[in-house]
């Protein structure tokens, strides 16, 4: 039940009368990985058979019946007046992808959820809002900034639709001029697009505007001897460089590992180079 309580409804199907129930549900169906189905009988009686061939008879009094991802099931109306409804649920990390077709929340942001407590967060270079909206859905008080006014407008519109406690602002990411303090600052795939001479100031500004005990999460491209970065990013971290900027902070996670872009080389293979991922905690006051 705890897992189900952490799920979010991203699609509600129309109610189906007995003779309208799709053939796919009668013959046998399974929803994709990461998709839970909530089955409700609105009236009448329904026979539900799941993967283990165990059958149960459901009525309106039974309330919600959750069907796990990739679990085969069939339904059979037992009365002519049967009416049912299906709603689809997913975890927070997949919600905006499934509901709005956005890019998935960055995996590093999802992983940090197990370490970083809910608080006041800043998403630097929010783009379409894949990380900021996820954090808002998880209960963070979120400020999202980007230098693209259209992106800022889109994030604000989605936040309003979803009733999230967040706001998006237009901001020059090279400015190193944050105006508030935060418990958590996220910058995924952002530093590689900054002007190199502003990077030290931007990092120092992030650090200065992180509350004691707060966290910074950075993911960015690298250029190393073993894997030179062929992409024309304005800035790329060198081996160990990002860690040095955070000397004196507690390193919760640090890794330099191969990643791939959507871009491909002349042979049609994904272009690979290293990315640095670092989650670090500011010392307590």
Where on the chain are the PLM-derived regions?
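Class I (Rossmann-like) S-adenosyl-L-methionine-dependent methyltransferase catalytic domain
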Residues: 3, 26, 91-116, 122, ...
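Conserved short histidine dyad/triad with adjacent acidic residue
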Residues: 14-33
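Short, conserved beta-strand element in jelly-roll/cupin
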Residues: 34-47
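Short acidic-glycine-tyrosine-enriched beta hairpin
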Residues: 53-70
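Ligand-binding loop in jelly-roll beta-barrel domains
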Residues: 69-91
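A short acidic, Gly/Pro-enriched loop at the edge of an enzyme's catalytic core
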Residues: 177-185
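A short SAM/SAH-binding and catalytic strip from SAM-dependent methyltransferases
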Residues: 184-198
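A short glycine-rich, Lys/Arg-flanked "PGG" loop and its adjoining helix->strand segment in the class I
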Residues: 200-212
